[in-house]
Amino acid sequence: MTKRAIVLLSGGLDSATVLAMAKAQGFETYALSMRYGQRHSSELDAAKQVASALGAVRHEIVDLDLRRFGGSALTDDKLDVPTGGASSGIPITYVPARNTIMLSLALGWAEAVGGRDLFFGANAVDYSGYPDCRPEYVAAYETLANLATKAGVEGDRFHVHAPIIDMTKAEIIRAGIRLGVDYSMTVSCYKADDDGRACGVCDSCRIRRAGFEAAGVPDPTRYQNA
């Protein structure tokens, strides 16, 4: 019997690794990305490349403009993307309810295609301030998924997977390399240019660069100032 999984795919390092993990577990993968009003589209271009390279059966990009709401440095140009390293509290790069919105889209698609597994790249190590990247959030969403769907109510349970939630960036990179992920395709930068070149100074770039250093792996990221 074919096992189908919906994998949230941003085009970044973490979600690319999770897509490879789902495939390695024998799932037929369906990749889901969202054009939510983020500062650049190069991560979605990266998502297309990654989905193709890692053999996703289908890749969908859903349009849902969260810029209408704002509330995040990633969707509101009036807010600056931080470059000074991690701070206490919830980072301003948190997009209100983004993971919940995307998981709900994934849940609907999964039920439609007969999939019962959702994968996403939540990580509590690098971004412990994000409320929707905690283990208790993952467990709570799985409970919701099984209360809110026909399949769940009838006992055909959904499972929500966050396989990198307790991994360091170096561990994620090493795992991805073992699975054949080409990280040169991925875009993690909050301020990447139209060609996908990273700024090198935002917090996401800093964490990514440090991860490659800690993993002892050459950094394939293309930087704007290189």
Curated annotation (Swiss-Prot):
Its cofactor is Zn(2+). It catalyses: 7-carboxy-7-deazaguanine + NH4(+) + ATP = 7-cyano-7-deazaguanine + ADP + phosphate + H2O + H(+). The keyword Transmembrane does not apply. It holds the Pfam family QueC. Binds 1 zinc ion per subunit. InterPro entries: QueC, Rossmann-like_a/b/a_fold. It comes from the Bacteria. Catalyzes the ATP-dependent conversion of 7-carboxy-7-deazaguanine (CDG) to 7-cyano-7-deazaguanine (preQ(0)). This is 7-cyano-7-deazaguanine synthase.
